[in-house]
């Protein structure tokens, strides 16, 4: 959901594009009519109010994972007026936040390969890779690996705790002595 944490009424809109990979540089394409719907189109919230947008996937029920870039934009309803040295200036501050919406495959197939310091996702849905620095119990490195992608581990020759997390499964890749 969104929360208006300003002192003024704000308008919130949402826009949605399909992306080929769930990353910042993912190539955007228009969504086929009716594949993903959301409600409402926009919200107007007073100071301190919160509300949510709902997303509905009505596209194909197949074995392909899909990614959508969701952009939430906050726009003030009135421009701020600043008077300085006898001049009136109006300004707007528009804030946007982006997130990735993931639609998992209808039938999920989890599979991976780990060899020579490379973790590969050979299934059809994403999983999370986590690792520690050395043999610490603090897992300070984490990456989501989408289907067909691979991750080359920078310090593969060094001892570390490395694992894959998928659903409620934890799969150790390397352990510490």
What are the residue ranges of the model-derived segments?
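Beta-sheet-dominated interaction scaffolds and their linkers
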Residues: 1-6, 42, 106-113, 142-144
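Short acidic, flexible loop segments centered on an aromatic residue
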Residues: 6-31, 73, 124-139
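Envelope-exposed proteins and targeting segments
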Residues: 10, 51, 66-68, 97, ...
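Solvent-exposed coil/turn segments that connect beta secondary-structure elements
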Residues: 17-19, 50, 56-60, 73-75, ...
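Intrinsically disordered, low-complexity Pro/Gly/Ser/Thr-rich segments with frequent PxxP/GP/PP motifs
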Residues: 27-61, 135-161
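Terminal connector regions
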Residues: 58-108, 159-177
């Amino acid at each position: 959901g969104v929360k208006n944490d300003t002192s003024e009424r704000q308008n919130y809109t949402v826009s949605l594009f399909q992306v080929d990979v769930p990353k910042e540089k993912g190539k955007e394409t228009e969504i086929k009519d009716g594949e993903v719907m959301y409600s409402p189109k926009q919200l107007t919230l007073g100071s301190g109010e919160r509300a949510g947008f709902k997303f509905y996937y009505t596209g194909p029920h197949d074995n392909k994972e899909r990614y959508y870039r969701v952009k939430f934009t906050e726009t003030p309803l009135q421009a701020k007026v600043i008077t300085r040295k006898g001049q009136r200036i109006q300004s707007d501050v528009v804030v946007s936040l982006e997130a990735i919406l993931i639609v998992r495959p209808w039938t999920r197939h989890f599979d991976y390969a780990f060899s020579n310091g490379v973790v590969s996702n050979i299934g059809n849905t994403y999983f999370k890779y986590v690792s520690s620095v050395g043999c610490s119990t603090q897992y300070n490195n984490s990456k989501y690996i989408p289907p067909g992608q691979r991750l080359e581990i920078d310090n593969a020759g060094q001892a570390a705790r490395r694992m894959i997390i998928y659903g409620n499964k934890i799969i150790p890749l390397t352990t510490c002595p």
